[in-house]
Amino acid sequence: MTLEEARKRVNELRDLIRYHNYRYYVLADPEISDAEYDRLLRELKELEERFPELKSPDSPTEQVGAKPLEATFRPIRHPTRMYSLDNAFNFDELKAFEERIGRALGREGPFAYTVEHKVDGLSVNLYYEDGVLVWGATRGDGEVGEEVTQNLLTIPTIPRRVKGVPERLEVRGEVYMPIEAFLRLNEELEEKGEKIFKNPRNAAAGSLRQKDPRITARRGLRATFYALGLGLEESGLKTQLDLLHWLREKGFPVEHGFARAEGAEGVERIYQGWLKERRSLPFEADGVVVKLDELSLWRELGYTARAPRFAIAYKFPAEEKETRLLQVVFQVGRTGRVTPVGILEPVFIEGSVVSRVTLHNESYIEELDVRIGDWVLVHKAGGVIPEVLRVLKEKRTGEERPIRWPETCPECGHRLVKEGKVHRCPNPLCPAKRFEAIRHYASRKAMDIGGLGEKLIEKLLEKGLVKDVADLYRLKKEDLLGLERMGEKSAQNLLRQIEESKGRGLERLLYALGLPGVGEVLARNLAAHFGTMDRLLEASLEELLQVEEVGELTARGIYETLQDPAFRDLVRRLKEAGVVMEAKERGEEALKGLTFVITGELSRPREEVKALLRRLGAKVTDSVSRKTSYLVVGENPGSKLEKARALGVPTLTEEELYRLIEERTGKPVETLAS
């Protein structure tokens, strides 16, 4: 077989295998047997081995259908920032958006807009060089996302190669799970006794972050694209409408609806029509995206710190559904607060099944006049939290029963006390309070002890191995090995995570300890103001009131907790266990999780730059691999640059590296370098 004959057959096989991948993984409707599929794949692999010049990173032999690939999810910096969108929730706010544009441009509307479905999925960025896909990443914080290239390549409509595009190109879009695929996936998970996803967006996000791309491929993910980052100027495009058609012509899926509108009134007409059709769409849409159609106006208007001035998300109103309140259960939180939770007849609202709703407190129930057996109107507050809007009293039959508050704690039986509107269990030994306190302490935003899940916390409490969070640091491997389903490796991993949690710093510790009214922001402010736990413990009420965002009620709650002998004893035992009680310097872990390689000559001594990177939490290695986050390129770079390009590793100039450090630390490099 000649090279040209092999090339022709290889291209035929790749197209054929991709088609059957689509039939099997996305449609779940294969046309050939597994044996026939394996034969095609084997033939392709043999030809690529025989003619190595025909190998390609976008070949099916490198993707799903070959041996399993391990996704790395390394941090990756977007060449240009990915912004969020500001929101409009009604026509008046849409009109205000148009008026702001008019003032900024110095001329009156109406303006021409492109209106697009706002698909509720996961934002992604595809980066191409010379028409070849180098990597794909999630949006992350807009500047740094996670690389998910291998999993994105399981979506058959994403082009691996494109022709006639700028040399460097970023294509932005949304990965989503169609409603039908979501319902099918949840049925499968339910049958296996596994945890189901709450909504299609969560399912898409969870599926895109699977370590085994073959699992991702079976989930039926789709993608739709709508924007360019790098390459927009070079494309020569004049309007957003042209851009969407250009994306389709280049082979990118544009699966969401779009239309052109004149002025806010024109947008409103499209919005109202699409709102009526919302539930007939194959995907979840939570509104429309309105963009000025003329791209030259984008450059004039620019961006705020978080969003473009030329675009806005016009959100659909929260969906409301009728259902029945079947019963009320009472839950005890980590502070002892007792919260009534309504159990509803399950109802599908805005993409997920709602079967529980918080009823907050006694006053809320009285004001709502809700009873067990009532028909209620439910929506999702902010599109997220289920909430009872009102009671449908016209549907009452007389069989409804008033909600009775318990006099004793539903968990420990201790008599409840009432503090204003709140019923509280005062028992310090209440198992529910202990459970919630430990669960909160171990949560990701607190001390981040990932291996300490709810079931394990329950077991530790049942066995008497822990009574509070300080006891976590006294756990030994022998204690854990005595627990059901706890092997040696799991025990070692948990103990390692507990040990690592000691160094999270004062900010995370204050949030983890659950001081009254102290969330993430207030914990940060307290840590920055006082610096150490000792200084905070000595603080007067007046000093607490000087902290940013601390009001009188919050200050009093914090002060009373700090003076509580039980709290002070807990802090003492945590300190004895080695938990860090000081605030971290900003930037101390600014580059944690990133791996750097340096090539070429820098303006500073290379060892000095390496030391700086390590001091900021980064790892520095001598060789480029797929695990490399960035290659820092100086003058006269070596072969590492070619390897980085081949592997799709992002590069930074020395100046870009220092800019990254300054952004992450908030300090000039000169003050950080030793």
Curated annotation (Swiss-Prot):
Sites where the protein binds NAD(+): D34, A35, E36, Y37, D38, S84, L85, E116, R139, E174, K291, K315
EC number(s) given by UniProt: 6.5.1.2
NCBIfam families: dnlj, PRK07956.1
Similarity annotation: Belongs to the NAD-dependent DNA ligase family. LigA subfamily.
Names of required cofactors: Mg(2+); Mn(2+)
Protein name: DNA ligase
Keywords: DNA damage, DNA repair, DNA replication, Ligase, Magnesium, Manganese, Metal-binding, NAD, Zinc
Gene Ontology MF term list: DNA binding; DNA ligase (NAD+) activity; metal ion binding
Gene designation: ligA
Function in brief: DNA ligase that catalyzes the formation of phosphodiester linkages between 5'-phosphoryl and 3'-hydroxyl groups in double-stranded DNA using NAD as a coenzyme and as the energy source for the reaction. It is essential for DNA replication and repair of damaged DNA.
